[in-house]
């Protein structure tokens, strides 16, 4: 498919308006900070109010509170982490200190306890009033409809809240705090105070000396732990319950020691917590249960409880959790802590050592990364409240037990990974044995061995399901009948990814969910949704009627109600749609067996949300030129209205356009890619072209890229605004030949573009990519000289040495990447040594004639930065132009704003010099000596 003629026609159309176009600006690095994103959008339960954050990339953001129908809008500066009350009458949120105030506090070297802190903001819908309470620690709301909320204020830190002039309405109308709060603050500062508050009535209850609190999901109770610390004795802890709406407080328990990990059941009738009376640092805890209706308090589990493994007790690193029906209390047990002997050695008198043992389940490097997690490890148990019995469910051999969402079923799914831990070093997968676990007795039965993908419980707890990689099918285990059924056998199409080009099993397309009562499981093939009987008695049913496959449209059910565990086919079901050929997207409905199109177009539609109690929807819509603002509509989607405008300044800048292109690679396979052109494109001119790639990218035809400082890659919007064409080819791979596969796709695609479009300057083309893309660049410059300059981020240059390397962020060894996953060698170093050498750029550095800029950071947790060093010193040894940017203490992709800004400047200076003929910057021509580090940036251009 050739570049659509409409694009070329558009270019001539634009030429007719050059006078207007010249008024626009080109994007610069100074523009990044003010470009905004939209985050955390949500609808009120009735769908009448929308709330979302609008945040610049650097600076103070804002919270937008908008009435959907009228468009009336309120903006709260610096507000974030908003929660709409389940009753739908107000929204509460954090309010940050001003960024400038925080910065000044750091400049002034204020202590942590003196730093400015968040405030609480509450906005009641339909008013212009904003309540603000300083020194917020946290707040919470129940799950069920209610007007109540609870929050903690740290009275001792109120003075650290910034003093600022009142903001104009409706941002800050200056209302007084809720009744009783200001007066109490004047009398004393008791530390952390819990306020239980109803913003609709002003009713408030305070609980001093609060340590932690929790709200019952039903919204009828707040429980808290209070603590009064004593210097010479144990602290006095109390469990306080406050009933709603009456605000009746009750002391449930009072003891000297330590209480923690408070839990409450759904109706607010039972409380649980851990308590220890130990005075030592290593504390043993007991589990307590309070039943409100009976006003009964019991220690229900301790280290000597029947059923407790020897030497174990309730773990302080696990918070108890009630089942939905309140009949079970789940918690974790762990070995009892032992007091460490007194240490009298000085630091310089101790050895420091890691011992790597060949039979360790995990490498030492991985153990050290996970050290805190391993120390906090505990094993799930259950206390059956009616029976008064404890059952241990998980243990060292089977450390994980999954339950149904409401934890009401009598069986769970156990998972044991220990038999396969060592081999994960080179397989990279996560095989496990699956067990059916009886929650009443703790008995377990092994159901499957070496299950590798997508194991889960059905929502009703009647079945276990997993994808069997050997048979490429979905298997279901019936908990009661203890039988296994191949449920996808009747689906006439693959239920796995047919495009898989990794030397490992193909991943399944996944599950859409289950129908009520676990009556059917919904399974995806590439395009459609299938209804399958988990017992295998009824024939499979294609719910979408083959429409997806017939039209090359991938249909996926949207889960829009977090309270719903099932897919209810008796109601309207919404599906997302993506056309794999044209890259168009949209939404469909499935109702009464009929599939209907709601919305479909040349956009990327995403982030669909629905109001809890109304047919009101939010979604995002974007193209390369259109920012993904928020749109809203009712159920038919026919009258969509845009309710945000995050970046109106974009209209004043040159941008660009993108088209889907096709070509034949050197093996005559048809590939797709994306070609981006400048907005003020003139087909009579030639333009330098940057070629960027990773693997497959054409599905992102309508992805929008806000101008942003680079983490590691080019910004396509910045490039087209500044006169670059950008080509992004798809790459397909052959096992054992990752480098040559990249060459086949990228070089063939680049040649096809320059032969097809004379406006591409074939003498001024560059390469850019990061990580796997960086490796492919390092390989390409050893195979071709058609590119004038290349920039590679975090490249693997030597697969031989990288094979035995460590991914330091996780501690994992890298062997699995070459044998099973992305690097695609498909065998070990000793099985396929030639493949490792042939695909390693380091062995062919003498062929390189392309100037190469690399970025490889010394805290890279994915690709050891020694790989960049190997490439650098080899090219330096051969006198070839090469530079390496090493951002100190930075990760695989840059995280710190100053580093991102710096990389953006240097990367585009590099390309501008080689591809546009602009003067070289000082750093590129002369470097920067270590003696000038941090003092000289070298940005100045040298004529």
Q: For each predicted feature, which ranges?
A:
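Bacterial Sec-dependent N-terminal signal peptides
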Residues: 1-23, 796, 805, 858
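Active/binding-pocket-proximal capping segment
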Residues: 479-495, 536-550, 593, 635-639, ...
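Glycine-rich His-Gly loop
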Residues: 417, 578, 622, 692-696, ...
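Surface beta-strand/loop "capping" patches
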Residues: 373, 561-568, 653-668, 935
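Beta-propeller folds
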Residues: 21-617, 622-628, 632-633, 921, ...
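Hydrophobic/aromatic beta-strand patches that form the interior of the parallel beta-sheet core
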Residues: 391, 413, 485, 631, ...
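Cap/lid segment of the alpha/beta-hydrolase catalytic domain
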Residues: 490-502, 637-639, 644-764, 768-770, ...
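Active-site-proximal cap/loop segments of hydrolase catalytic domains
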Residues: 705-943
């Amino acid at each position: 498919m050739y570049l659509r003629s409409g694009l070329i026609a558009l270019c001539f159309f634009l030429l007719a308006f050059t006078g207007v176009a010249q008024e626009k600006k080109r994007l610069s690095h100074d523009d990044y900070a003010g470009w905004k994103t939209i985050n955390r959008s949500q609808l009120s339960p009735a769908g009448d109010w929308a709330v979302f954050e609008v945040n610049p990339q650097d600076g103070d953001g804002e919270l937008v509170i908008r009435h959907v129908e009228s468009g009336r809008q309120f903006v709260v500066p610096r507000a974030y982490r908003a929660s709409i009350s389940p009753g739908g009458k107000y929204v509460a949120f954090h309010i940050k200190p001003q960024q400038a105030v925080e910065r000044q506090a750091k400049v002034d070297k204020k202590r942590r306890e003196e730093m400015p802190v968040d405030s609480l903001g509450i906005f009641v819908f339909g008013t212009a009033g904003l309540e603000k309470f300083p020194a917020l620690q946290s707040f919470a709301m129940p799950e069920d409809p209610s007007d109540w909320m609870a929050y903690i204020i740290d009275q001792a830190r109120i003075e650290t809240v910034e003093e600022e002039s009142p903001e104009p309405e409706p941002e800050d109308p200056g209302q007084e705090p809720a009744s009783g709060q200001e007066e109490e603050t004047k009398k004393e500062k008791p530390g952390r105070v819990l306020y239980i508050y109803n913003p609709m009535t002003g009713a408030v209850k305070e609980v001093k000396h609060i340590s932690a609190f929790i709200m019952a999901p039903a919204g009828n109770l707040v429980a808290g732990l209070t603590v009064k610390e004593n210097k010479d004795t144990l602290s006095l802890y109390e469990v306080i319950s406050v009933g709603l709406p009456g605000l009746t407080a009750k002391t449930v328990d009072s003891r000297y020691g330590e209480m923690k990990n408070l839990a409450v059941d759904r109706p607010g009738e039972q409380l649980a917590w851990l308590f220890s009376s130990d005075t030592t640092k290593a504390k043993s805890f007991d589990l307590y249960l309070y039943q409100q209706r009976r006003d009964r308090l019991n220690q229900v589990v301790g280290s000597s409880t029947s059923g407790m493994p020897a030497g174990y007790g309730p773990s302080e690193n696990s918070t108890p959790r009630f089942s939905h029906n309140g009949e079970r209390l789940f918690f974790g047990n762990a070995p009892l802590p032992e007091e460490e002997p007194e240490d009298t050695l000085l630091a310089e008198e101790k050895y420091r050592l890691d011992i790597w043992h060949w039979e360790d389940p995990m490498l030492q490097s991985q153990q050290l990364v996970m050290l805190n997690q391993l120390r906090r490890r505990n094993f799930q148990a259950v206390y059956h409240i009616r029976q008064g019995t404890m059952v241990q469910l998980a243990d060292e051999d089977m450390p994980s037990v999954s339950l149904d969402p409401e934890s009401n079923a009598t069986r769970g799914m156990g998972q044991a990974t220990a038999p396969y831990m060592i081999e994960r070093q080179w397989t990279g997968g996560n095989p496990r044995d699956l067990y059916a676990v009886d929650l009443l007795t703790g008995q377990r039965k092994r159901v499957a061995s070496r299950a590798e993908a997508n194991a889960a419980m059905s929502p009703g707890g009647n079945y276990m399901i997993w994808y069997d990689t050997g048979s490429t099918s979905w298997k279901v285990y019936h908990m009661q009948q203890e039988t296994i059924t191949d449920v996808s056998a009747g689906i006439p199409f693959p239920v796995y990814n047919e495009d898989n080009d990794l030397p490992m099993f193909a991943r399944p397309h996944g599950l859409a969910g289950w129908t009520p009562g676990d009556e059917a499981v919904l399974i995806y093939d590439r395009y459609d949704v299938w209804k399958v009987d988990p017992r295998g008695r009824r024939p499979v049913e294609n719910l979408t009627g083959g429409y997806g496959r017939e039209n090359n449209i991938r249909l996926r059910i949207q889960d829009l109600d977090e309270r719903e565990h099932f897919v209810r086919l008796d109601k309207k079901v919404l599906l997302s749609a993506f056309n794999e050929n044209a890259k168009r997207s949209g939404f469909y409905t499935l109702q009464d067996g009929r599939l209907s199109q709601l919305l479909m177009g040349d956009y990327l539609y995403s982030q669909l949300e629905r109001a809890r109690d109304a047919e009101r929807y939010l979604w995002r819509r974007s193209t390369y030129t259109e920012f993904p603002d928020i749109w809203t509509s009712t159920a038919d989607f026919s009258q969509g209205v845009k309710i945000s405008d995050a970046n109106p300044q974009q209209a004043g800048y040159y941008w660009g356009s993108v088209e889907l292109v096709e070509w034949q690679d050197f093996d005559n396979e048809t590939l797709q890619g994306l070609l981006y052109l400048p907005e003020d494109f003139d087909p009579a001119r030639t333009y330098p072209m940057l070629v960027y790639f990773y693997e497959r990218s054409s599905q992102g035809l309508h992805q929008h890229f806000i101008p942003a400082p680079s983490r590691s890659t080019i910004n396509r919007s910045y490039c087209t605004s500044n006169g670059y064409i950008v080509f992004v080819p798809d790459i397909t791979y052959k096992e054992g030949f990752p480098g040559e596969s990249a060459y086949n796709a990228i070089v063939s695609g680049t040649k096809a573009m320059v032969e097809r479009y004379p406006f591409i300057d074939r003498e001024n083309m560059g390469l850019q990519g990061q990580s796997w893309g960086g490796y492919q660049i390092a390989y390409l410059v050893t195979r071709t000289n058609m590119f004038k300059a290349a920039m590679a981020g975090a490249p693997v240059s030597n697969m031989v040495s990288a094979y035995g390397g460590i991914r330091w962020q996780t501690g994992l060894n890298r062997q699995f990447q070459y044998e099973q996953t992305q690097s695609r060698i498909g065998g070990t170093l000793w099985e396929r040594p030639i493949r490792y050498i042939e695909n390693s750029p380091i062995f062919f550095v003498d062929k390189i004639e392309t100037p190469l800029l690399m970025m490889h950071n010394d805290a890279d947790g994915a690709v050891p930065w020694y790989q960049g060093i190997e490439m650098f010193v080899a090219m330096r040894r051969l006198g070839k132009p090469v530079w390496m940017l090493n951002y100190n203490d930075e990760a695989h992709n840059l995280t710190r704003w100053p580093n991102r800004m710096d990389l953006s400047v240097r990367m585009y200076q590099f390309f501008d010099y080689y591809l546009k003929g602009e003067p070289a910057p000082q750093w590129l021509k002369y470097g920067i000596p270590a003696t000038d580090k941090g003092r000289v940036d070298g940005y100045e251009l040298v004529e």
